[in-house]
Protein backbone atom coordinates (compact mmCIF):
# COMPACT_ATOMS: atom_id res chain seq x y z
CA UNK A 1 0.00 0.00 0.00
CA UNK A 2 1.24 3.50 -0.85
CA UNK A 3 1.61 5.63 2.29
CA UNK A 4 1.25 9.35 1.52
CA UNK A 5 2.07 12.08 4.00
CA UNK A 6 -0.38 15.00 3.74
CA UNK A 7 1.74 18.15 3.16
CA UNK A 8 4.67 16.58 5.04
CA UNK A 9 2.74 15.67 8.21
CA UNK A 10 3.52 12.26 9.70
CA UNK A 11 2.24 12.07 13.28
CA UNK A 12 -0.35 14.83 13.41
CA UNK A 13 -0.90 18.16 11.74
CA UNK A 14 1.74 20.88 12.02
CA UNK A 15 0.08 23.65 10.04
CA UNK A 16 3.01 26.08 10.31
CA UNK A 17 5.31 23.54 8.59
CA UNK A 18 2.96 22.20 5.92
CA UNK A 19 4.33 22.43 2.37
CA UNK A 20 7.70 23.67 3.63
CA UNK A 21 10.30 22.08 1.33
CA UNK A 22 12.48 20.96 4.29
CA UNK A 23 9.45 19.40 6.00
CA UNK A 24 8.56 17.58 2.78
CA UNK A 25 12.15 16.35 2.32
CA UNK A 26 12.07 14.93 5.85
CA UNK A 27 8.94 12.89 5.09
CA UNK A 28 10.51 11.65 1.84
CA UNK A 29 13.69 10.60 3.69
CA UNK A 30 11.53 8.59 6.09
CA UNK A 31 10.20 6.64 3.09
CA UNK A 32 6.79 8.23 2.61
CA UNK A 33 5.26 9.63 -0.54
CA UNK A 34 4.04 13.20 0.03
CA UNK A 35 1.03 15.18 -1.20
CA UNK A 36 1.94 18.83 -1.73
CA UNK A 37 0.06 21.96 -2.80
CA UNK A 38 1.54 23.60 -5.91
CA UNK A 39 0.94 27.03 -7.42
CA UNK A 40 2.29 28.59 -10.60
CA UNK A 41 2.61 32.37 -10.72
CA UNK A 42 4.41 34.16 -13.57
CA UNK A 43 5.86 30.82 -14.75
CA UNK A 44 7.39 30.10 -11.34
CA UNK A 45 6.36 27.20 -9.07
CA UNK A 46 5.51 27.71 -5.40
CA UNK A 47 4.31 25.51 -2.55
CA UNK A 48 1.59 26.60 -0.14
CA UNK A 49 -1.96 25.69 0.79
CA UNK A 50 -3.91 28.96 0.76
CA UNK A 51 -1.38 31.00 -1.18
CA UNK A 52 2.02 30.65 -2.85
CA UNK A 53 4.62 30.62 -0.04
CA UNK A 54 7.77 28.68 -0.93
CA UNK A 55 9.43 29.23 -4.30
CA UNK A 56 10.70 25.95 -5.75
CA UNK A 57 12.30 24.67 -8.93
CA UNK A 58 10.56 22.35 -11.37
CA UNK A 59 13.17 19.69 -10.56
CA UNK A 60 11.83 19.50 -6.99
CA UNK A 61 8.40 18.50 -8.33
CA UNK A 62 9.82 15.74 -10.54
CA UNK A 63 10.39 13.45 -7.55
CA UNK A 64 8.38 10.26 -8.27
CA UNK A 65 7.19 10.12 -4.64
CA UNK A 66 5.35 13.46 -4.82
CA UNK A 67 1.62 13.81 -5.44
CA UNK A 68 1.21 17.41 -6.61
CA UNK A 69 -2.15 19.06 -5.96
CA UNK A 70 -2.41 21.94 -8.43
CA UNK A 71 -3.92 24.91 -6.61
CA UNK A 72 -4.47 26.96 -9.76
CA UNK A 73 -5.09 26.00 -13.36
CA UNK A 74 -1.72 27.39 -14.55
CA UNK A 75 0.07 25.01 -12.17
CA UNK A 76 -1.99 22.09 -13.46
CA UNK A 77 -1.27 22.81 -17.13
CA UNK A 78 2.44 23.35 -16.49
CA UNK A 79 2.80 20.15 -14.47
CA UNK A 80 0.94 18.14 -17.12
CA UNK A 81 3.28 19.55 -19.79
CA UNK A 82 6.31 18.71 -17.59
CA UNK A 83 5.00 15.16 -16.93
CA UNK A 84 4.85 15.76 -13.17
CA UNK A 85 2.45 13.55 -11.21
CA UNK A 86 -0.43 15.88 -10.37
CA UNK A 87 -4.15 16.34 -9.98
CA UNK A 88 -6.57 19.25 -9.81
CA UNK A 89 -9.89 19.57 -8.04
CA UNK A 90 -11.96 22.16 -6.28
CA UNK A 91 -15.24 20.82 -4.99
CA UNK A 92 -15.02 17.39 -6.62
CA UNK A 93 -15.17 14.39 -4.32
CA UNK A 94 -12.88 12.37 -6.60
CA UNK A 95 -10.02 13.58 -8.79
CA UNK A 96 -8.11 11.56 -11.37
CA UNK A 97 -4.34 11.95 -11.08
CA UNK A 98 -2.09 12.18 -14.12
CA UNK A 99 -0.92 8.60 -13.35
CA UNK A 100 -4.45 7.21 -13.30
CA UNK A 101 -5.15 7.05 -9.55
CA UNK A 102 -8.44 8.14 -7.99
CA UNK A 103 -7.84 10.75 -5.26
CA UNK A 104 -10.94 9.99 -3.17
CA UNK A 105 -12.56 11.20 0.02
CA UNK A 106 -12.90 8.51 2.69
CA UNK A 107 -16.69 8.38 2.28
CA UNK A 108 -16.52 7.60 -1.45
CA UNK A 109 -16.57 4.23 -3.19
CA UNK A 110 -13.04 2.86 -3.53
CA UNK A 111 -11.27 0.75 -6.15
CA UNK A 112 -7.85 -0.86 -6.43
CA UNK A 113 -6.66 2.45 -7.97
CA UNK A 114 -8.06 4.63 -5.17
CA UNK A 115 -6.09 6.73 -2.72
CA UNK A 116 -8.18 7.08 0.44
CA UNK A 117 -7.74 10.68 1.61
CA UNK A 118 -7.92 11.58 5.30
CA UNK A 119 -9.64 8.51 6.78
CA UNK A 120 -10.77 9.02 10.39
CA UNK A 121 -8.45 6.28 11.71
CA UNK A 122 -6.00 3.63 10.54
CA UNK A 123 -8.47 0.91 11.52
CA UNK A 124 -11.18 2.14 9.16
CA UNK A 125 -9.44 1.73 5.81
CA UNK A 126 -11.43 0.33 2.90
CA UNK A 127 -10.19 -3.00 1.54
CA UNK A 128 -8.08 -3.38 -1.61
CA UNK A 129 -7.13 0.27 -2.18
CA UNK A 130 -3.89 1.54 -3.72
CA UNK A 131 -2.96 3.82 -0.85
CA UNK A 132 -3.83 6.26 1.88
CA UNK A 133 -3.06 9.96 2.46
CA UNK A 134 -3.14 11.26 6.02
CA UNK A 135 -1.72 13.78 8.49
CA UNK A 136 -1.09 10.71 10.67
CA UNK A 137 0.53 8.47 8.06
CA UNK A 138 3.08 7.22 10.59
CA UNK A 139 0.34 5.16 12.24
CA UNK A 140 -0.12 3.10 9.07
CA UNK A 141 3.40 1.57 8.99
Show which residues each predicted segment covers.
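Phosphate-group recognition and catalysis centered on beta-loop-alpha active-site segments
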Residues: 1-141
